[in-house]
Amino acid sequence: MKRILLFLFLSFPALSQSYKVSVGSNITSYEFANSAGTNPISLRSESGLALGLSREFSLSKVFVLDLGLAYNQFNSVGDIQNIPLAYSTDFMGLSLGVGPSLNLGKGLSFSAKAVASASSMVKGNQFIQNRYVDLFADKQFNSLRTLYGYSFEINKQINEQVGVFAKYQHLDSYNFGSSTLNFIPSTFSIGISLRK
């Protein structure tokens, strides 16, 4: 699996445009639904770290494709029957984005992309009644998680090789069944881009 990811990340040199590194914050909402279709837990959004490493390819003069690795913390706090609880999870995976990039002049550009992401939990805990519960045994958390959404990005080219950018991304997961958990993260990030 690692070799496939490395091949995808390093291939297509003729189409290569830039490497991007970003850091930011996820504001994540959890949506639980039990077999009756109701949410028995009162949860609030909580922040978590977001890191990204990607490679952007020019598909044409207007459209770009972004393929990358992502590390995300999807966290939440709340209560169930007045018992406080907190979820802390770490996910790693792949992200793919495609969309138009518009040149605004003076080194500025704006891009809007449709985004798909697939990731797996590498660590997860639930804090409830003064103890931590490992979430690896919970299939709602420890399963392949696919998310879909969009992103908006403003780029400023500093010189021919180096640029900086600010990005907003919104994703939703869609799990179906008798009892489900869906993540809805909104991510604000900044980063640096290096042209080859």
Model-derived segments and their meaning:
Residues 3-13:
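Sec-dependent N-terminal signal peptides
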Residues 16-61, 65, 187, 193-196:
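Short glycine/proline- and aromatic-enriched beta-strand/turn motifs that initiate or cap beta-hairpins
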Residues 19, 61-65, 107-110, 156-164:
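Repeated loop/turn-to-beta-strand initiation elements of outer-membrane beta-barrel proteins
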Residues 20, 32, 70, 74, ...:
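Predominantly the C-terminal beta-signal and adjacent terminal strand-loop region
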Residues 25, 49-57, 69-71, 94-102, ...:
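Residues on the lipid-exposed face of transmembrane beta-strands in outer-membrane beta-barrel proteins
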Residues 30-43, 73-92, 120-144, 175-181:
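Flexible, solvent-exposed loop segments that connect beta-strands
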Residues 62-78:
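Short hydrophobic interaction/assembly module
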Residues 85-107:
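Helix-adjacent hinge/juxtasegments
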